[in-house]
């Protein structure tokens, strides 16, 4: 019997997933049910693109609902108030110097379930995230990337 994957996640991440789940189960399901009803009213399903699209949307939403429910069921919730600021861990905000672009960047280290690179939320399983875990202020890390090696220095941990 295989073990379920545990998802490391913050309280904020749990809240965000719960909100998305509620939206999908209520609003989105109703919208799709209505689309299917309208598409069925067109008759012949063999060439009914509206029906096919609605069924595809339904499959996507139901898949996402199952995925979120699984994440929440198998969540390992991190209490950010108990984090120490001397070592990088999931839930830490880390200010680093990126030597390649000569700039300072703040990353939030989160579990894979709530990673969002656009918001600088990087997964503890990502190359940069995993290299930062366990490091301290002043430490430097090197991360292999497709076009070489990126180098960072940890400036602060919050």
Curated annotation (Swiss-Prot):
Signal peptide: none annotated. One of its GO terms (biological process) is DNA-templated transcription elongation. It comes from the Bacteria. Residues 14-76 form a coiled coil. InterPro entries: GreA/GreB_C_sf, TF_GreA/GreB_CS, Tscrpt_elong_fac_GreA, Tscrpt_elong_fac_GreA/B, Tscrpt_elong_fac_GreA/B_C, Tscrpt_elong_fac_GreA/B_fam, Tscrpt_elong_fac_GreA/B_N, Tscrpt_elong_fac_GreA/B_N_sf. Keywords: Coiled coil, DNA-binding, Transcription, Transcription regulation. GO terms for molecular function: DNA binding; RNA polymerase binding. Necessary for efficient RNA polymerase transcription elongation past template-encoded arresting sites. The arresting sites in DNA have the property of trapping a certain fraction of elongating RNA polymerases that pass through, resulting in locked ternary complexes. Cleavage of the nascent transcript by cleavage factors such as GreA or GreB allows the resumption of elongation from the new 3'terminus. GreA releases sequences of 2 to 3 nucleotides. Belongs to the GreA/GreB family. NCBIfam families: greA, PRK00226.1-2, PRK00226.1-4. This is Transcription elongation factor GreA. It comes from Clostridium acetobutylicum (strain ATCC 824 / DSM 792 / JCM 1419 / IAM 19013 / LMG 5710 / NBRC 13948 / NRRL B-527 / VKM B-1787 / 2291 / W). The gene is greA.
């Amino acid at each position: 019997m295989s073990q379920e994957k545990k998802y490391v996640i913050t309280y904020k991440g749990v809240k965000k997933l719960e909100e998305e789940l509620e939206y999908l189960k209520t609003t989105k399901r109703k919208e799709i049910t209505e689309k299917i009803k309208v598409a069925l009213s067109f008759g012949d399903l063999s060439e009914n693109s509206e029906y096919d699209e609605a069924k595809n949307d339904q499959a996507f939403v139901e898949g996402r609902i199952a995925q979120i429910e699984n994440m929440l069921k198998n969540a390992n919730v991190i209490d950010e108030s108990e984090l120490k600021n001397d070592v990088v861990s999931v839930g830490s905000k880390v200010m680093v110097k990126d030597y390649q672009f000569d700039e300072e960047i703040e990353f939030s280290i989160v579990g894979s379930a709530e990673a969002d690179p656009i918001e600088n939320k990087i997964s503890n399983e990502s190359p940069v995230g995993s290299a930062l875990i366990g490091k301290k202020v002043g430490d430097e890390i090197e991360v292999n990337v497709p076009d070489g090696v990126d180098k960072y220095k940890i400036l602060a941990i919050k």
